[in-house]
């Protein structure tokens, strides 16, 4: 589909039987794939939903979340499941009802607000804007510290980008990100570098 998911949204409203039949097939295949991953020894699985934010509040459950919920139910308590639904931070109740253990969030909202909105019941993953990976190591370090400090004393943060690394991402920026996180402690300051140079 397109970046605004026009064709997919049109199918949802104009041909709902076809839409749901397609998503049921994708969900069934995803469940089989996840079960194979678990059998192969993965420690966690992550479900990526790239279009949840394009859906209205009313359409989100039927058009996306219920299918993620089916995958989570199929996994059961075998391993943790991370749910990442891009742009869906305003759909908290439906997100929680998916049943994940961890919820990822993109960079469009403060990660502490997202954690608070989830009621502090779940770990969160995110949410450095991937555009920073194309800047300088100093910019990456500064923004990473801003996010870590803003998250404060809350528990349950898996630091990550708010979405994938872009092709123009710089290796030195990635190194700065990892080094900043590894050397950060909850007293809001950096400790001496432990990474090889």
PLM regions with names:
Residues 1-197:
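Active-site loop segments of alpha/beta catalytic cores
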